[in-house]
Amino acid sequence: MTIAAAIDSRKAGAPARSKTSRIARVDIISDLTEAEAIWRELETRQLATPYQRFDLLSAWQQEVGPREGAKPFIVIATDNDRRPLALLPLALRHQHGVRTATFMGGKHATFNMVLWDKDFARDASAADLAALLRGLRAKDAVDMLALTQQPRHWQDYLNPLAMLPRQRSVNDCPVLTIVPGDPPTNRISNSFRRRLKSKERKLQSEGYRYHLADSDADIERLLNWFFRVKPMRMAEQKLPDVFAEPGVEAFIRKACRAPITGGGHVIDIHALECDDEVIAIYAGVADGHRFSMMFNTYTMSARSRYSPGMILMRHIIDHHAERRYRAIDLGIGADEYKRLFCKGDESIFDSFIPLTFRGRIAALAMSGLNRAKRLVKHNQVLLRLAQRLRRVFR
């Protein structure tokens, strides 16, 4: 089936719309500075996740992208009046002779999404997506789009790229849905709250407190602690330390310091502290609708037995519920602690879109590989076998 036919099949049953696309022009920009004004303007009327903020992805591109061989590949679609309708925040990599465009942010973005003009996204059609892909093919600058970890819906809007051929992502994302005004026990049960309160009382005599970092000095101090403790936690779990990869620490520090309009930072840091020690931090992105965790760790000291990470998570949930947020997620993956708070799953998908013959071969390979990974991740027998093999060859 061709991509055009696949788009049409996904639109079957939808209200009839014009066969004429509103996209009149597709441009590719390889300079963040050149794209910044349009990007920031779209942010004010966007449909996208907080992971697509310019200040977050520009920090990643400046500090991490070059070290991964990723160059800015920012696609902007405009109408006849040169009004921006969509901005694809992509990075171009050359892998095995294939020019592949992926979302900026790499493994540090839980969700990837195009920045859409909301009015355009609401009525996006098969003709619009076909025009976007046609414009990219005409540029002959990329063989394949590897668009992974996209939410199918965001803020009650359907993600227009869900009309393209897609498959479920390797991992799901546990999510807690919050109904504004509901009692706290609808978010976290009474019995679980009592267990956490009992642990919390044991910390009260030690100057225990929860806070959201709001000054540069606080942010710097908490990040210094994180980058000292996290490697020990990763080593304890026999996991690779992704935060030690080139450029990652500089990226995170830059994004955590960057303020956003209305208060807060591009990455917010929530912390639990005692008089003489940080005992847990959770850091993530927020947009007034949803808080999404990016990274966390907790103390290596004896205070870890009081479950400071769990206590902090309860504070974060209540903090955002009081501000009428509608959802909280703890990142991709099915870690057991996430299920204690997040009972639902976010529907996320991958799309591998070939634009050339070479891209078609690569898209088939990447699609098949990700399907195999998902099969292993969601089959306990295969997962245990894979984990044993990983330990043998580590």
Regions from the PLM with identified roles:
Residues 2-25, 32, 151-185, 323-388, ...:
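Active-site/acyl-donor-binding loops of N-acyltransferases
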Residues 24-81, 85-101, 150-170, 186-304:
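A conserved beta-strand-loop-helix scaffold within acyl/acetyltransferase catalytic domains
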Residues 105-116, 167-177, 206-209, 346-349:
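Acyl/amide activation-and-transfer machinery of modular secondary-metabolite enzymes
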Residues 106-141:
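A gly/proline- and charged-residue-enriched helix-loop-helix capping module
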Residues 118-123, 182-189:
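Short, polar/flexible loop-turn hinges at active-site or ligand-entry regions and domain interfaces
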Residues 120-121, 130, 243-363:
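Aromatic (often tryptophan-rich) hydrophobic motifs at membrane interfaces
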Residues 133-155:
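ATP-hydrolysis module of ASCE/P-loop NTPase motor domains
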Residues 140-141, 230, 324:
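Residues at helix C-cap/C′ positions in short coil/turn segments immediately following an alpha-helix
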